[in-house]
């Protein structure tokens, strides 16, 4: 199959969408498909990547004449399907949808974000203005939680499929007998190590995470030692550092951004992984932790609930207090931590493996072409 991916953002940017699209491109090429990418992100020349870049402030990933460029690329490539990737509102990606419809290409559009009420209002207004529901699109969401608000806007005539984000799950699982496997199996000094990984941006509620950790520490018996590591960088880091200083929370560290290998090593010594954001469309970092054998604490209304069941892969809660109680329970109950960790190490989140993801998108491509 000749596939053209369209995404506002792509490598060398390293956000969640950019990395996921790049991994999907790699997996599809390894499966024998011919895959190219069109993006509005500036960067080095890469094989099969078309960069439609305008000289705009802050390297904004948009182009005022993007549709014309996209039409030219689509006309020259003999593609079988256009696969468009959008966040909440992605102007260049939706130019790609419009260009593909005009070119007569089947279109699959993956929504990587959770549509909030404002975003839903925007898409209802766009439907009133342009009638996009009648364009023959197949929409996909990365989780059931993300699909629900999309279905509410798209209506019954627009297919909204759920295709998980992909992960090479075997690469995150500690091998039996390895240092990583031993580190997970043995608690070491007995300190309960709580880990979180993600961009330190307001949408992820990082200050709320610090309050959660502080409250949990207050409720855990004093004879249970705790420490926490929050990996990532972003605009909220300064406020987080001030919070930790003022509250004298020296047991929480902010080491900055980590590579994948560094995150794997960190998870090898983690006892609990926390993903507290309520509007998490998927939660790739939580999936990595689950694949690495770490019990996950997350919101029941987030995309993490697609691969974490209460008491099986971790604990879920709907409120802040629920999450605090879950962290406290896991910190106090080493037997529960151990049983969840063993389950996570011995089973795979099959729906999130690349073979399952490729099969899901192949079905969507067939649906769009029919």
Label for each model-derived stretch:
Residues 257-258, 265-270:
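Short alpha-helical donor nucleotide-sugar binding micro-motif in glycosyltransferases
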Residues 4, 183-214:
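Conserved donor-binding/catalytic core segment of Leloir-type glycosyltransferases
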Residues 310-321, 329-334:
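Conserved acidic donor-binding segment of nucleotide-sugar-dependent glycosyltransferases
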Residues 295-298:
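Short hydrophobic beta-strand element within catalytic cores of glycosyltransferases
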Residues 241-258:
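Nucleotide-activated donor-binding/catalytic signature segment of Leloir-type glycosyltransferases, i.e.
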Residues 145, 166:
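Carbohydrate-associated surface elements
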Residues 336-351:
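A short, well-ordered alpha-helix in the C-terminal region of glycosyltransferases
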Residues 278:
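Aromatic "clamp/platform" in nucleotide-sugar-dependent glycosyltransferases that forms part
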């Amino acid at each position: 199959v000749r596939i053209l991916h369209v995404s506002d953002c792509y490598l060398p940017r390293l956000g969640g969408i950019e990395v996921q699209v790049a991994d999907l491109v790699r997996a599809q090429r390894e499966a024998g498909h011919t895959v190219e990418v069109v993006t509005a992100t500036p960067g080095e020349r890469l094989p099969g990547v078309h960069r439609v870049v305008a000289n705009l402030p802050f390297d904004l990933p948009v182009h005022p004449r993007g549709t014309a460029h996209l039409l030219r690329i689509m006309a020259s490539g003999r593609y079988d399907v256009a696969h468009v990737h959008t966040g909440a509102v992605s102007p260049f990606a939706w130019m790609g949808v419009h260009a593909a419809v005009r070119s007569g290409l089947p279109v699959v559009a993956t929504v990587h974000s959770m549509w909030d009420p404002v975003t839903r209002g925007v898409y209802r207004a766009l439907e009133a203005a342009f009638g996009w529901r009648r364009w023959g699109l197949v929409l996909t969401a990365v989780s059931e939680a993300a699909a629900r608000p999309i279905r509410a806007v798209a209506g019954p005539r627009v297919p909204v499929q759920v295709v998980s984000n992909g992960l090479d799950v075997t690469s995150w699982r500690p091998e039996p007998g390895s240092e990583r496997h031993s580190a997970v199996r043995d608690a070491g000094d007995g300190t309960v190590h709580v880990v979180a990984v993600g961009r330190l941006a307001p949408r992820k509620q990082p200050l709320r995470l610090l309050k959660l950790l502080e409250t949990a520490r207050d409720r855990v018996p004093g004879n249970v030692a705790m420490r926490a590591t929050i990996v990532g960088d972003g605009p909220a880091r300064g406020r987080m550092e001030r919070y930790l200083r003022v509250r004298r929370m020296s047991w929480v560290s902010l080491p900055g951004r980590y590579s994948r290998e560094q995150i794997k090593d960190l998870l090898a010594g983690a006892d609990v992984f926390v993903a507290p954001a309520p509007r998490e469309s998927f939660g790739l970092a939580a999936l990595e932790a689950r694949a690495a054998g770490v019990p996950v604490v997350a919101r029941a209304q987030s995309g993490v609930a697609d691969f974490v069941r209460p008491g099986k892969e971790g604990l879920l809660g709907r409120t802040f207090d629920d999450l605090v109680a879950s962290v406290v329970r896991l910190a106090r109950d080493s037997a529960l931590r151990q049983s969840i960790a063993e389950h996570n190490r011995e089973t795979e989140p099959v729906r999130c493996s690349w073979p399952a993801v490729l099969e899901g998108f192949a079905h969507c491509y067939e649906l769009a072409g029919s």
